[in-house]
Amino acid sequence: KISNQSIKSINGLNRISSENIYSNYDYPSADNSSVDGFAVNAKDTHGISKKKFKRLKIVGSISAGSKPFKKFLKKDQAVEIMTGGILPRGTNSIIPIEKCSLIKDKINNYILIKQKFKKFENVRFKGSDFKKKDLLIKKNTLINSNHIMAFKALGVGNIKVKKKINIIFF
């Protein structure tokens, strides 16, 4: 019988898992943007047509990995958001940067929108890749690079694998 050993998950490539490995938490951990653009409430884009555009005031910026935006967005406001940025409260859709124009006046910055957007457009939902306690890898599975990436993203530190066996030829 081959015994088991605990190793760092990043060193698990081409090793055999000796136990089932589960996700420690939801991933992504919050609803976030799948594109660079502007977080808005989709209702603010209703009524837009080829002849009727809409202007939304930019009230902030969110980068991936930053803390959630503190303000609740009001009607006709937008927040610049990078891919992976957490959706601010009061928003439910992301307008890709290439689908709008930037406008500046002496005091404020705005985006000009020329089309409607649906609720949850360009949004990745909390847990859409992995839910907490999802099975990542079954016992006795050969660990590959995709598994290593999942372990890293989900904070899996150590894993149990089968010990390497030594074979000696004479």
Where are these regions (language model features)?
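Helix-rich terminal scaffold detector
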Residues: 160-170
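Phosphate-interaction motifs
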Residues: 1-157
